[in-house]
Amino acid sequence: MAYSTYGRHITMDLREVAFEKLNDVRFLKEVMYEAAAQCGATVVGESFVQFSPQGVTGVLVLSESHLSIHTYPEEGFAAIDCYTCGYTVDPAVACDYLKAALGGRVVGYRALRRGSGAIEDLTTLHLAAANN
């Protein structure tokens, strides 16, 4: 069976997110798993770390690639990254779910197509579709 190396990669930065959400490893794990489910991804592994005095890093290893979050509660900041291989699972769905669950304001967003030659920036296309 031949496999495609085609993938989509989204990075998203959020600001003005509540400290309590960004410092709650249980909450973040729950919303990350739900984000993966919403986009149809299959979780095959995880690692979540609560830092002291604050902050969380969480990674879900997906059959289709990965979904990660790094939080800075003292700054109200979250860095989210989702890469999925193939055509079925849409990382934008996971990122949209996380934005809704966390609240805050998107201050950085990049959508890329990978694995089929040069990395292609799809950011404008995704944002235009999202605004319709």
Curated annotation (Swiss-Prot):
Its EC number is 4.1.1.50. Keywords: Autocatalytic cleavage, Decarboxylase, Lyase, Polyamine biosynthesis, Pyruvate, S-adenosyl-L-methionine, Schiff base, Spermidine biosynthesis, Zymogen. The modification Pyruvic acid (Ser) is found at S65. Binds 1 pyruvoyl group covalently per subunit. It catalyses: S-adenosyl-L-methionine + H(+) = S-adenosyl 3-(methylsulfanyl)propylamine + CO2. The keyword S-adenosyl-L-methionine applies. GO terms for molecular function: adenosylmethionine decarboxylase activity. Is synthesized initially as an inactive proenzyme. Formation of the active enzyme involves a self-maturation process in which the active site pyruvoyl group is generated from an internal serine residue via an autocatalytic post-translational modification. Two non-identical subunits are generated from the proenzyme in this reaction, and the pyruvate is formed at the N-terminus of the alpha chain, which is derived from the carboxyl end of the proenzyme. Its cofactor is pyruvate. Coiled coil: none annotated. The active site is at S65 (schiff-base intermediate with substrate), H70 (proton acceptor), C85 (proton donor). It holds the Pfam family AdoMet_dc. The keyword Lyase applies. One of its GO terms (biological process) is spermidine biosynthetic process. One of its GO terms (cellular component) is cytosol. It comes from the Bacteria. The record marks E64, S65 as: Cleavage (non-hydrolytic). HAMAP family: AdoMetDC_1 (MF_00464). Catalyzes the decarboxylation of S-adenosylmethionine to S-adenosylmethioninamine (dcAdoMet), the propylamine donor required for the synthesis of the polyamines spermine and spermidine from the diamine putrescine. Heterotetramer of two alpha and two beta chains arranged as a dimer of alpha/beta heterodimers. This is S-adenosylmethionine decarboxylase proenzyme. It comes from Symbiobacterium thermophilum (strain DSM 24528 / JCM 14929 / IAM 14863 / T).
